[in-house]
């Protein structure tokens, strides 16, 4: 009985995520993910350059 209960819980969660995903929430989360990607890419490049120059032993 517990497997059926978990299947129904995941069904409800997936339906709710589908409803929210096809509205404006998915666009907002995609914009946020894009901003975070660029921030971490810049941090990675800066640390990579510092690793080859200043922090070289």
UniProtKB/Swiss-Prot annotation:
Transmembrane domains' residue ranges: 6-26, 35-55
A Pfam family hit: DUF1328
Entry annotated with the keyword Lyase: no
Main localization (coarse): membrane
Highest rank taxon of the organism: Bacteria
InterPro entries: DUF1328 (IPR009760)
Keywords assigned by UniProt, alphabetized: Cell membrane, Membrane, Transmembrane, Transmembrane helix
Compartment(s) where it occurs, according to its Swiss-Prot or TrEMBL record: Cell membrane
S-S bonds: none
GO cellular component: plasma membrane
Membrane-protein topology: Multi-pass membrane protein
Family, per entry: Belongs to the UPF0391 family.
UniProt name for this protein: UPF0391 membrane protein RPB_2510
Lineage: Bacteria, Pseudomonadati, Pseudomonadota, Alphaproteobacteria, Hyphomicrobiales
């Amino acid at each position: 009985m517990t497997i059926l209960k978990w299947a129904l819980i995941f069904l409800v969660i997936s339906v709710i995520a589908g409803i929210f995903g096809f509205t404006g929430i998915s666009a907002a989360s995609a914009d946020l993910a894009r901003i975070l990607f660029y921030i971490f890419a810049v941090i990675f490049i800066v640390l990579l350059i510092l690793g080859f120059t200043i922090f070289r032993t």
